[in-house]
Amino acid sequence: MSEIDVVAPNLKRRLSGVTATVVRLIPVQARMIGIVTTGPGLPADLPHIPLRRAATLPRDRWRVWHARRNTEMALGLILRRILRRKYKLLFTSAAQRQHTGFTRWLIRQQDALIATSPQAASYLERPATVILHGVDLTVFHPAADRAALRATLGFAPEDIVIGCFGRVRAQKGVDLLVQAALRLFPSRPRARLILSGRITADNQAFADDLQRQIDAAGL
């Protein structure tokens, strides 16, 4: 393993958007800088060190602790202030919402901030560098036979298909998209909407209510 300059923690076992970002981004970054992950639930082919090693790296120089969650920001503070590790603290935020008081306090302790959109940056209350999410075109690209793919999904070639991908929860505004479809689709018979994403237990009632609205409209 090359010299470690950046440690990117992932302190959540369950797959989430943050975890997916780490999994996709680290291999790209590892071709340019000395970066490793730490924490559970990550693929074995990622450059990785145990948490105990992240907490005992030598103090010979500064390294970057790149957090994406509150728990990871908090651990970075512990490593630097209590264990006296030489970490510069970096936080990347994709959230487009008001942060809690605790999160705002954690953000104030960071040395630098990244936001994945101008909208996310507007909620940070501190200057942030905006770096938009990229797309790996070797993985995500149009199908070779789009008509066959549409048929597999039950869509006709002339259908106008709108896709929404990601966890189904109120915070993401999925309900606004459904409400717009309920108003517009009756007069646009070729329009189709597909939602694809995980529904966690705490959002099941929200998803069920959306399904009831769709069923009631006969769509």
What are these regions (language model features)?
Residues R108-P142:
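A short, active-site helix/loop in glycosyltransferases that binds the activated sugar's phosphate group
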